[in-house]
Amino acid sequence: MKKIGLVLLFSQICLLSYSQFVARAQIKENIEGICDIKNVYALLGMLKDQKEAICSLKDSEIEEKLNKEVQFVKDSTNYDDKGMVSIIINCKGEVVQCKIDNKTKSPILDEQVVNVFKTLTSWKAGKLNGDKVDSIRLWSFEITKGKITFK
């Protein structure tokens, strides 16, 4: 009886090791351009068979663009804050939504940050098991002494 229990336990562990963690985002509003509203994924590039949507600009280039184009931080060199931007990229590599998820203390700053992210239009769609899918990307940012950096 103990041997059967051990065999069952071992087989369950083996099955779990082959399964894959997949996070689906719950989209409550209708977003024009989404390929499949019920299957928008938060992909994790470090997991097998998951590839995040990729922007043509590197994160360091996006940071540089934010610091160059967001007038609020250029005018407020002692300003400290943090926030988060989310972008939904459809299965065709098109940005269908860009918004602030965690707002900063300034609506003006939020608007300027989103406006910069909206200019990022060249994307490769995310992939799950080799198939192009709708996906969401998040960028947490911090502002220290008027300089924006990603966390």
Placement of each model-derived feature along the sequence:
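Charge-biased low-complexity segments
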Residues: 6, 18-151
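Sec-dependent N-terminal signal peptides
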Residues: 4-13
